[in-house]
Amino acid sequence: MKKKLFLLIMSSLSFGSCSKKITPIDSISIRYNNHLYLNVNVKDKIHGNFIFDTGWNGVSLDSLFCNKNGLDYKTKDIKISGIGNSTRTAKLITDTIHFKFSEKEDRFSTSTAMLDLKSMVGKTIDGIAGIQTFAQKPYMIDYVSQKIIFINSVKGYESVNAQFEDYKIYLPLSIILKNGKKIQGKFMLDTGSDQTILNSNFFMSDGIHNATDKKKFFAKGGVGGDSNGYFLPVVAADLGKFKLKKLIMTVSTDTLGALANPNYMGIIGNDLLDDFNIIFDHQKEKIWLKPNKNFNRNKNKLFRSISFFDTGEKWIIAGIVENSEAYRKGIRMNDQIIEVNNVPVEKIDLDKFVEDLKANDSLHLRIKREDKKIELKLKLNVFIKS
């Protein structure tokens, strides 16, 4: 199970990220590891690691990143909600901030959110760059070569019936359940989520609530607090003219927040999006798709029944599948992992560790839970079949 970046929804506020100057450039390098990471300079000198998130309207900065780099701004308190069942207080920076996404791509923001991103998403994130970041001209996300490429041609691509509304992009998606029924409608295109998620309004649908092969999970939802739901094997999903087969969908059971919103059916995350090269044209309000070499390759790691959140000194259990071996062995949400296979976690690169995991790998975990220290051994068994 992979970590999930929250979707931020602001109350009575609209964030903007505007262009300072646009000089022709072919592409910008990104890093793709379930999320899209950008190298960003703040105020022309301070390097930051930002997530490119089309589910977010503006720009956000991590509060610790600001404090460590002496970024002192005028702020006011705001309320935000997101994936999960609660709201939090954050800061709205009212000063103008300049960002550089390459030597030739400058932006500025006049309304920037500042919040504790590292405690919600992980120690490596310094900020979020939202949907308007590159909206001034057509661009293509290439998940394979890990680039954002500015282009002038859509030759070889298929148009999808996209809807641009209130700084969000919606695409039609049809999900085919194992009982033959279809759930179809508009889903938000969200590069800030590593998962495609069906909103909780549809949990009671025939073929979902009564599916015998679904698996319940518990997860941290970022800004909105804990976010729970089920993993559900489905026959296929149709996106435009393209059919993606044998998928594991996520179905939310949240009662509040973005995943309980009745105005759209769910979100399309990177687990589906990374099967394609995707062209965005915000001026014409159009989206084009072309399958890449990952198309319909089963990338699901169906043994990852636990997910970790890296604080630096320890890993926090940020997600777990109920009745998986990890759960049966006693691992619980918010457990603090101190050592893995006799190696302190501060000496382990979490991303590489997770990427290298294989089915049936054995883990020896040293855990701190409140004032107790626990040792557990387990195998990463496959917990669900697509």
Segment roles from a protein language model:
Residues 1-27:
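Bacterial Sec-dependent N-terminal signal peptides
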Residues 18-386:
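Pepsin/retropepsin-fold aspartyl endopeptidases
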